[in-house]
Amino acid sequence: MQRRQFLATLGGGLFHAAAAQTKMNFIFILADDFGARDLSCYGNRFWSSPNIDRIAREGARFTNAYAACPVCSPTRASIVTGRYPAATGVTDWIPGRPSDPKGPVTTPRTAIELKLAETTFAEALKTAGYRSASVGKWHLGGEGFYPTDQGFDVNIGGNHTGSPPRSGKPYFGPFQLPNLTAREGDFLPELLTKAAVGFIEANKSNPFVLYFPHYSVHLPLGARAEDIARHKAKANGRYEPTYAAMVEAMDASVGGVLEALDRAGIADRTLIVFFSDNGGLNYEGRSKVKITDNSPFRAGKGHLYEGGIREPLVMRLPGVIKPGTVIDAPVCSVDFFPTFCDFAGVKPGKVDGVSLRPVLTGGKLKPRPLFWHYPHYSNQGGEPGSAIREGDWKLIEFHADGRRELFNLKDDESEKVNLIRKRPDIARKLQAKLDAWRKSVGAIMPKKNPNADPHWPGFQLSGDEKPTPPAD
């Protein structure tokens, strides 16, 4: 269903009926390149995250939450539309990595903006009287495709850029972002938090949806000097001090949002979500230690292994989500749009995700497969591929050489044992479903390169990024 049809269908009577009752608010806080183990509530012991941990303690923590892609723009598109990247055409970070003319396959170009024909959750919720804002990183197109062109009433700080402006010290003003004034030395996470809090305070008497995608903790690393120094003094080579300071700044931002909800007296009718767009960067930073450690998950950003797509996810809604809930059901970034619509009493239209309301209220989700399609080489060394997870089983098909890797995630969450030879029955079943899904969404595949260099060096992979030989 196209955008205009969707809005016409849901307009009119639904708006007036919904406006007569107290509605729930929605806040979605998105971290950038945040690792699956970067929070205390997920086992991190090197730095603290008391505010995000508070959401988990007072709400729910998910153990099998996934981004729809191992890089940023496609996952962002999936969040705001509820549709898989292969369906929206945004399959790589925008504008994407060019195809290597000597590589074994030619990779397709990603869409360089989210099509205006797509329906965003801002547009869907607008039909029920919601006011909406996007505060922070957008990275779904340039002018003409900004948040305010996609149904959001307010855009602060979002444009075509995928990383923080670099006119000065990383994450510090001055810099140029839409509707965001930054003086010399202003710290970007704090500026964005101030804007987000301002939107909450201005709309505390009206239903609202706040999409709050931080630029943090994306490269280049940057934080306050005193916070970096504090971590350098205690890191002792075990972790990246600047990254740790960035995580704590992110947590402080979440704390600012929670305090704003408490002051406004609307915490009990606000669903708040914290999530990341892809896995953490698992290579060395300036301190010669890994920027983050996704262990026990394999690899990181840019890879279809668990370290590239498994994410931290915590949600809170007082009176609805039981405090301390742990949810093991596999969920995906396509699920947030229908979840918001479900709680708001709005039909979501055509989406690939499902509402998470059942598991948030003590029930279960119907079994379903989850899909990934990333037909590109990533800047982090990832290969073009597609994947499917159904139950405990996960199959990855690599496009360049056709190899397949099959894992039982219940027994092997680190993806060390490739069971493709031992369980060909499972592999055939998953492959058939993956093929059918790709056909249904019109997924664009890489093509064999007739000009491929047989000596093409490819990426120099090491450690857990190397292919997994089949187990005998």
Description of each model-found segment:
Residues 44-49, 66-71, 108-119, 182-192, ...:
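A short beta-strand-to-alpha-helix junction
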Residues 45-77, 82-87, 131-133, 153-159:
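Short, structured active-site-proximal loop/turn typified by the sulfatase FGly-forming signature C/S-X-P-X-R
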Residues 22-26, 59-63, 128-132, 153, ...:
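Loop/turn elements at helix/coil->beta-strand transitions in domains of secreted/extracellular proteins
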Residues 47, 146-151, 220-223, 259-320, ...:
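Histidine-centered active-site microenvironments of extracellular/periplasmic hydrolases
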Residues 1-13:
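N-terminal secretory signal peptides and thylakoid transit peptides that target proteins
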Residues 154, 280-304, 321-325, 329-409, ...:
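C-terminal cap/loop subdomain of S1 sulfatases and analogous C-terminal strand-loop tails that border
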Residues 7, 21-24, 31, 35-36, ...:
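Long, internal low-complexity/basic segments
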Residues 90-131, 138-210, 214-225, 229-244, ...:
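Formylglycine-dependent
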